[in-house]
Amino acid sequence: MAATSEHTILQFVSPSSTASATTSVLTARIHPLVIFNVCDCFVRRPDSAERVIGTLLGSILPDGTVDIRNSYAVPHNESSDQVAVDIDYHHNMLASHLKVNSKETIVGWYSTGAGVNGGSSLIHDFYAREVPNPIHLTVDTGFTNGEGTIKAFVSSNLSLGDRQLVAHFQEIPVDLRMVDAERVGFDVLKATSVDKLPNDLEGMELTMERLLTLINDVYKYVDSVVGGQIAPDNNIGRFIADAVASLPKLPPQVFDNLVNDSLQDQLLLLYLSSITRTQLSLAEKLNTAAQML
């Protein structure tokens, strides 16, 4: 008599495996507005809240990349074993956003913190009922590793036969889409601490130092070409010629006068802004004292 045995198989079931190929998530493309919104909501959170959550809005590109362009916070209460989300507020905010831009739909949700926790699975289940295969974005506002780490996850279900046991979060690549001006601000904000933001004069000094460095690099390149050390590049030569031709033909004395006039304007603006800050600080103290009386 042949012996028979039955085996129970544990398997991962990804939500994307049941969806079409166009909805499989490859990369989360995040625009800087989303990160700044998350940080702003975290700063304004109630004192009792350890983290904030919110809805991510955007679209799914043909290659499966999730383009995250906007977000809004959603009030919630969280304990060790349960999570309460203000669903009415979420739906009202979504309706308001759709009136402004109907092309932006729900693509996932975000939370602040170093990673996922027990409550993340419950919140992710809610958003999975709102949209197939949602993205979970985490922003480390506590600077655990010395900077604000940004991660994105998708969820896979660990099932025992037909029974779903637990959700497994799998990290996916994150692409921060920023222009140079946005990246400068982001690099300053993501640091643990900032000693001092440069004022206008310090910014001008840094710009001039960088300009001098670039001019020296051009001099070295031209000297190397003339000396036969490197082969000439016609494209670089035309670019340098166009840059030199775009400079106004001014006598040195006139140029010095223009720079000095601009410097005087900067000093005047700094003086006026200092007076304004002093006046605002004094008015705030007087207003506080009047309310206490």
Curated annotation (Swiss-Prot):
PANTHER family, sorted: EUKARYOTIC TRANSLATION INITIATION FACTOR 3 SUBUNIT F (PTHR10540:SF6), EUKARYOTIC TRANSLATION INITIATION FACTOR 3 SUBUNIT F-RELATED (PTHR10540)
Q: If researchers knock out this gene, what phenotype do they report?
A: Male gametophyte-defective. Disrupted pollen germination and embryo development. Hypersensitivity to exogenous sucrose.
Asked if Acetylation is a keyword of the record, the answer is yes
The record's Pfam families line, in alphabetical order, gives: JAB (PF01398), MitMem_reg (PF13012)
**Entry's Gene Ontology cellular component terms:** cytoplasm; eukaryotic 43S preinitiation complex; eukaryotic 48S preinitiation complex; eukaryotic translation initiation factor 3 complex; Golgi apparatus; nucleus
Gene Ontology terms describing biological process: embryo development ending in seed dormancy; formation of cytoplasmic translation initiation complex; pollen germination; response to sucrose
From the Swiss-Prot or TrEMBL record, give the protein name.
Eukaryotic translation initiation factor 3 subunit F
The family database entries (HAMAP family) matched by this protein are listed as: eIF3f (MF_03005)
Tissue expression per record:
Expressed in inflorescences, leaves, stems, siliques, roots and seedlings. Accumulates at highly levels in pollen grains, developing embryos and root tips.
- Any idea where the MPN domain is? 28-159
**Which cell locations does it reside in?**
Cytoplasm
CDD domains the UniProt entry points to: MPN_eIF3f
Assembly and interactions? Component of the eukaryotic translation initiation factor 3 (eIF-3) complex. Binds to TIF3E1 and TIF3H1.
Q: Which residues carry this modification: N-acetylalanine?
A: 2
Q: Which family does it belong to?
A: Belongs to the eIF-3 subunit F family.
InterPro entries associated with the record: eIF3f, EIF3F/CSN6-like_C, JAMM/MPN+_dom, MPN
What one GO molecular function would you report for this record?
translation initiation factor activity
**Gene3D superfamilies the record matches:** Cytidine Deaminase, domain 2
Protein purpose: Component of the eukaryotic translation initiation factor 3 (eIF-3) complex, which is involved in protein synthesis of a specialized repertoire of mRNAs and, together with other initiation factors, stimulates binding of mRNA and methionyl-tRNAi to the 40S ribosome. The eIF-3 complex specifically targets and initiates translation of a subset of mRNAs involved in cell proliferation (Potential). Involved in cell growth and differentiation, especially during embryogenesis and male gametophyte germination. Regulates sensitivity to sugars (e.g. sucrose).
Ordered alphabetically, the record's keywords are: Acetylation, Cytoplasm, Initiation factor, Protein biosynthesis
